Amino acid sequence: IKQYAGSIPEEKVIKVGMDICSALVLCESKHIVHRDIKPENIMVSEFGDYKLGDFGIARTMYHTTQATIAGSDRYMAPEVITRKEYGKEVDIYSLGLVLYWMLNNCKRPFIDADYIPSNEENEQAQLRRVTGDPLPPPKYGSRKLQNIVLKACAYEPKDRFSSAREMY
């Protein structure tokens, strides 16, 4: 989905969210954590379905937690960046950030949707996200969709959806 620029229709954001949630439901049933959900790893099929790709750093989680850094830090959950133990909630967070990006003119949290940030501003936005500043709502999307995205992107894993099935 990386080829998009500008405002993305809400229906498309919802379709991406539902299709990737379906992929994560399957991952969760197999105890797999993807760990690298980002726009570049979401492809569209010839039938218009969105697929999650690049399982190169995915890991199985059998009653254990991970504490290794893997994935793209732009979409990485705070607990991964800060090297805390984590579980499947990191995929919920990353999907939430992808949906946020789609609803915010392809800009990440703390970056104005109508502005091209400098590298320093991007770094400051990343720091604010990782240190727990509450995310502002994305610029576009219904209040209901914004609330779903913000819950998925909650700083504390316990405040996120507990599973992809719940988010779906």
Language model regions located:
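Protein kinase catalytic-loop region centered on the HRD/HxD motif
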Residues: 22-32
